[in-house]
């Protein structure tokens, strides 16, 4: 009973109701998504193919609804990427492979509707490559016919490939440009890091001297290194310098108080390391019992050479101006530990003129004239004493800025030991190492 009733309802409802709103419309997507004639013919074909699914009454109702609608009111689809909306886009004529692929795709899609479109395209491409010339000839002829027809239909046709609107370059170009930019950036970063390592690796450099030298003789690229990297390089450089100096178990000398403003940028940029043991040839015969020289690896190109004269009681620092070739002023400073332990009331500095190329002849008999500054009490003495006089290096650790003397001693006295300096050196100018 229920089956008969449902069948009668199915047969009665569409035929009896002529109101389009009450009519069941099984194909609304086909109706509303087919704006032009080609689409409409496809819809009719699909409707014909679906004749077996629906009974006759439903088909009649659908055709009545569709025929009563004016399809010219449906707007034409606007292409998203279309250049000018006034001109319809003219496609290129198909080549031989496109002719083959389109015909084969339609046939295969009808036979195997479950095939994925991408897999179908791959298979069609493989099959096309396997075809010989005789198999390809009909498709080539059809493509030539289509090309001639296209030429007649569109005599002014000019192939204009569309540009991508997102502004992205082609993948190959993008890779090449990114590689070039990355290479330039890495080279620039390597230059900056090596520059910082050269400067901070030397025991003489600290922050202020690095900045002043960088501003006066800066590299051609602007200093854009982040501050964190700069501080890291600074700490690494100081660590390296202290490691190279502290291998002998002695605290390193703080060369941050040495003025390096006169050192040229070329010398600083072309620094090379060398073996510290080369200094042994400059030691005097009686000085081998003393401490070896542990001044850092960059001292030769800086013009700073350290050697120890006559055991641990004297230490000489020779600073040479790299700009002058034949005549150079040598600023030397030698200080005796015993002077500070025995006479802490006056600060005494011993100045010795050293000819840098002639260390062997200059060191054995060094006279130490003493310059007394009676007006300066131990509060203004250059070094801390009595508590750090145990070792040679600790006796020369510099004091803080408030305790440094601000005087400069320049002496033209003939009592300075000139007998050991070579004849081609001028009268040396003696200054205490102080910062303005």
UniProtKB/Swiss-Prot annotation:
Q: What does this protein do?
A: Acts early in neural crest formation, functioning redundantly with the other group E Sox factors sox8 and sox9 to induce neural crest progenitors. Acts downstream of wnt-signaling at the neural plate border. Involved in the specification of neural crest progenitors fated to form the pigment cell lineage.
* Disordered as annotated region, ranges: 1-55, 145-183, 195-257, 322-346, 413-436
Question: Which positions are linked by Glycyl lysine isopeptide (Lys-Gly) (interchain with G-Cter in SUMO)?
Answer: 44, 331
At the highest ranks, the source species' classification is: Eukaryota, Metazoa, Chordata, Craniata, Vertebrata
- Spell out where the chain crosses the membrane: none
- Keywords of the record: Cytoplasm, Developmental protein, DNA-binding, Isopeptide bond, Nucleus, Transcription, Transcription regulation, Ubl conjugation, Wnt signaling pathway
Point to the regions of Basic and acidic residues compositional bias: 145-159
Protein name in the entry:
Transcription factor Sox-10
């Amino acid at each position: 009973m229920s089956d008969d009733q449902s069948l009668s309802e199915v047969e009665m409802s569409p035929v009896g109701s002529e109101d389009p709103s009450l009519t069941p419309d099984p194909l609304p997507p086909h109706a509303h998504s087919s704006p032009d004639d080609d689409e409409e013919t496809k819809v009719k074909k699909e409707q014909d193919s679906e004749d077996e699914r629906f009974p006759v009454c439903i088909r009649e109702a659908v055709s009545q609804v569709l025929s009563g609608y004016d399809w010219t009111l449906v707007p034409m689809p606007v292409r998203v990427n279309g250049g000018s909306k006034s001109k319809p886009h003219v496609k290129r004529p198909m080549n031989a492979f496109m002719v083959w692929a389109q015909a084969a795709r339609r046939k295969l899609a009808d036979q195997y509707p479950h095939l994925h479109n991408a897999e179908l395209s791959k298979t069609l491409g493989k099959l096309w490559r396997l075809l010989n010339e005789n198999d390809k000839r009909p498709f080539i002829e059809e493509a030539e016919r289509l090309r001639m027809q296209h030429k007649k239909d569109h005599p002014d046709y000019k192939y204009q490939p569309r540009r991508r609107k997102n502004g992205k370059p082609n993948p190959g170009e993008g890779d090449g440009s990114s590689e070039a930019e990355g290479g330039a950036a890495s080279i620039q970063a390597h230059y900056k890091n090596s520059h910082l390592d050269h400067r901070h690796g030397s025991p003489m450099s600290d922050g202020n001297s690095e900045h002043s030298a960088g501003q006066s003789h800066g590299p051609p690229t602007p200093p854009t290194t982040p501050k964190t990297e700069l501080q890291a390089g600074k700490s690494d450089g100081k660590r390296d310098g202290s490691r190279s100096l502290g291998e002998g178990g002695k605290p390193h000398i703080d060369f941050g108080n040495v003025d390096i403003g006169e050192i040229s940028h070329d010398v600083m940029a072309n620094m090379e390391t060398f073996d510290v043991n080369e200094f042994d040839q400059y030691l005097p015969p009686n000085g081998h019992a003393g401490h070896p020289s542990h001044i850092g690896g960059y001292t030769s190109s800086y013009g700073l050479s350290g050697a120890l004269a006559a055991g641990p009681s004297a230490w000489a620092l020779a600073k040479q101006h790299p700009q002058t070739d034949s005549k150079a002023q040598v600023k030397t400073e030698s200080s005796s530990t015993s002077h500070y332990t025995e006479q802490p009331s006056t600060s005494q500095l011993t100045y010795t003129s050293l000819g840098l190329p002639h260390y062997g002849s200059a060191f054995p008999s060094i006279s130490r004239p003493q310059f007394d500054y009676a007006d300066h009490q131990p509060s203004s003495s250059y070094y801390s004493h009595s508590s750090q006089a145990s070792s040679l290096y600790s006796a020369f650790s510099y004091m803080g800025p408030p305790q440094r003397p601000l005087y400069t001693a320049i002496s033209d006295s003939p009592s300075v030991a000139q007998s050991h300096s070579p004849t081609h050196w001028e009268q040396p100018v003696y200054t205490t190492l102080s910062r303005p």
